Amino acid sequence: MKIKQAMQEISRGCVEFIGEEYIRDLVERFYNTGERFCVKAGFDPTAPDLHLGHTVLLQKLATFQRYGGDVKFLIGDFTATIGDPSGKSETRKPLSAEQVKANALTYKEQVFKVLDPQYTQICFNSKWLNELGALGLITLTSHFSVARMLERDDFTKRYNNNQSISIVEFIYPLLQGYDSVALNCDIELGGNDQKFNLLVGRSLQRAYKLNKEQSVMTLPLLEGLDGVHKMSKSLNNYIGVTESANTMYAKILSINDEMMWRYYELLSSLSLQEIVMLKEQVNTGNAHPKAVKEQLALEITTRYHNIDLAKQAKIAFDNVFSKDEIPTDLAVFTCNEGEWIARVLVIAGLCESTSQARRDIRAGALKINKEKIMNEELKLSVGEYIVQIGKRRFAKVIIS
């Protein structure tokens, strides 16, 4: 019964699980002998700070820790300078080593908001990839063909559309796969857009004649606040794990009611049965969606702060939106005198694009210092402004 329960929790929410029986054997061995096994997941620090999208993987790693897994949290400081082409329609711009190092430091500091330090080792893939050398790289590339690389859907589309694919993009999955050779773990986790790369690691373990082939688990990508694209800092649709309790709580309440269930499944500690019961209560009118969403916001905010700050965030939110008050912890943005209002809204993170800003203004969603503004061509003069889009998006803008 213990093994069955452990495997149910481990497999919850996963998209695909390759080598599940091997993991069952490892978990059973842990229960019988106390012998632990190795689990890894890699994160390229392409932007500073972790967000809730990252925590889908982190929480699964934490689950493995409870059932005998020692986690190797891999920071791809080498591969981040190249850029993962997975799902991309064009070549990514490389990051500088300085940018990557600064971003990696934030990951290193924040990962223990989820993982147990006792069973976590932080690794950097520059340690072995810097030492690979020309001969090592040639040996590595000899294990894969161009035809095999073109099995990837994103590469195939770009090739058929005569879009550029750089050689280094072909090399990226091999370098990521070589991480599996260097660390020789039992299991690797990744987002469902990473399946090809994870299987490359499995193949390379076999090619380098290691004594195991890692099991592979893929997990869903968490949609961001827009409910469409995956959560990303570059799309400004993210909830950061270091954001203030007030901001985190308010952002969670801003997701739509349908997306709420996705967040429950991927982020909540409630069992699937409990989530189904909540959903039934909403569908039958015995619970209001807002109250259920507040429960989720309180749980997640408590996890990354504490219960007192989460309760204070709820009070602050209720004051803002039931009493039409302005939040006290507004993000502050600076713009130049004469900046176009649509551009200001994008800079302040209130709109994704100037075209969306125009639409919001036409819809009457814009308020500046509590006054509704309908002028799409407005240019702000020197001063400080409280800018608001809709009921829940605020920013303080300083024009200088």
UniProtKB/Swiss-Prot annotation:
NCBIfam families: tyrS. Signal peptide: none annotated. Keywords: Aminoacyl-tRNA synthetase, ATP-binding, Cytoplasm, Ligase, Nucleotide-binding, Protein biosynthesis, RNA-binding. It comes from the Bacteria. Transmembrane segments: none annotated. It is found in: Cytoplasm. Catalyzes the attachment of tyrosine to tRNA(Tyr) in a two-step reaction: tyrosine is first activated by ATP to form Tyr-AMP and then transferred to the acceptor end of tRNA(Tyr). Belongs to the class-I aminoacyl-tRNA synthetase family. TyrS type 2 subfamily. Its EC number is 6.1.1.1. InterPro entries: aa-tRNA-synth_I_CS, aa-tRNA-synth_Ic, Rossmann-like_a/b/a_fold, S4_RNA-bd, S4_RNA-bd_sf, SYY-like_C, Tyr-tRNA-ligase, Tyr-tRNA-ligase_bac-type. One of its GO terms (molecular function) is RNA binding. A motif ('KMSKS' region) lies at residues 230-234. One of its GO terms (cellular component) is cytosol. Pfam families: SYY_C-terminal, tRNA-synt_1b. Residues 339-399 form the S4 RNA-binding domain. It catalyses: tRNA(Tyr) + L-tyrosine + ATP = L-tyrosyl-tRNA(Tyr) + AMP + diphosphate + H(+). This is Tyrosine--tRNA ligase.
